[in-house]
Design a protein with these regions (language model features):
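N-terminal hydrophobic signal/anchor transmembrane helix of membrane proteins
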Residues: 70, 85-105, 190-207
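Hydrophobic alpha-helical connector segments
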Residues: 61, 75-103, 156-160
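Membrane-interface starts of transmembrane alpha-helices
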Residues: 145, 149-157
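Alpha-helical DNA-contacting segments of helix-turn-helix folds
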Residues: 59-66, 115
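Amphipathic alpha-helical segments used for helix-helix packing
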Residues: 99-121, 175-180
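Helix-turn-helix
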Residues: 15, 30-57, 61
C-alpha cells in the first residue's frame, strides 16, 4: 500500500473507484481492465497498484460503496419518525433498491469473482458494509412490524437477501435477450426493480 497521507490515499482510491464506476456504465465486468481504468484516472496504471492489487479489488470497493449508499437509505427509513404500515415498509425498501440498480448488478453478476480475487482485509471491510445492511433491515422489521417474532424476522431475511441476487437479471433485460424471448415465443412479463422487490416483500410481510 502506498505510504502517503491518509487524505491522499483516500483521494486516489476514490478516483480509481470513480473511474471504474464510469466504465461500468457502458461495459461489462469482463471488458474492463486495469489499463482502461488507468486511462480514465489522472495517473498511470502502475500507480493503481499502490492502492489495489487487482481489478476485482477495485470493483469490490465500488460494491462496498454501493452498500454504503443503500445503508444510508435504510437508515433514513429506520429513522423517519413515522409509523409505516407493512405496505409502506415494502414500498420504501423497494424504492431504495430501485435507486441501487448498480448494487444489484454487481450482486447478481460479479459477486464471486470480486470476493475470490481480493485481499482478506478488503473483503472484511466490504463484509462490514454488507453486515450493516443486514442489521438495518432487521431493525426496520423489528420497528415497523413489532408483532413479528425474532424467528419470523430471521426467516424473512433468509428469503429476501438471497432473493436479491435474482432481481437485476429479471428487471434489466438487454435488447438481445428480449428478442430471443420473442423468437422463442416465451410469454414473459417484464417488471421493474421496484415491482419485483415490492411483490416479494409484501408477500413476506403479510404472511
Amino acid at each position: 500500500m502506498f505510504k502517503g497521507t491518509p487524505e491522499i490515499v483516500t483521494q486516489r482510491r476514490e478516483e480509481i473507484v470513480n473511474a471504474c464506476e464510469e466504465l461500468y456504465q457502458t461495459k461489462s465486468f469482463k471488458e474492463i481492465n486495469l489499463k482502461e481504468i488507468g486511462a480514465v484516472t489522472s495517473f498511470s496504471r502502475p500507480t493503481i497498484y499502490n492502492y489495489f492489487q487487482t481489478k476485482e479489488e477495485i470493483f469490490l470497493a465500488l460494491y462496498e460503496r454501493e452498500y454504503d449508499r443503500w445503508n444510508a437509505e435504510l437508515e433514513s427509513i429506520l429513522n423517519s419518525g413515522q409509523n409505516f404500515s407493512r405496505k409502506q415498509v415494502a414500498e420504501k425498501i423497494a424504492m431504495s433498491l430501485e435507486r441501487r440498480a448498480q448494487l444489484l448488478r454487481l450482486l447478481s453478476m460479479n459477486n464471486f469473482d470480486m470476493e475470490a480475487n481480493s485481499r482478506e482485509e478488503l473483503l472484511a471491510s466490504f463484509k462490514r458494509a454488507y453486515g450493516r445492511s443486514l442489521d438495518l433491515f432487521r431493525k426496520i422489521l423489528e420497528k415497523y412490524c413489532p408483532e413479528m417474532s425474532s424467528e419470523e424476522v430471521k426467516e424473512i431475511m433468509y428469503v429476501f437477501f438471497p432473493f436479491m441476487f435474482g432481481i437485476y437479471p429479471y428487471a434489466e433485460v438487454t435488447d438481445k435477450q428480449r428478442k430471443a424471448m420473442e423468437e422463442a415465443d416465451v410469454d414473459y412479463i417484464y417488471h421493474s426493480i421496484f415491482e419485483i422487490t415490492y411483490n416479494c416483500l409484501i408477500r413476506l410481510l403479510d404472511r
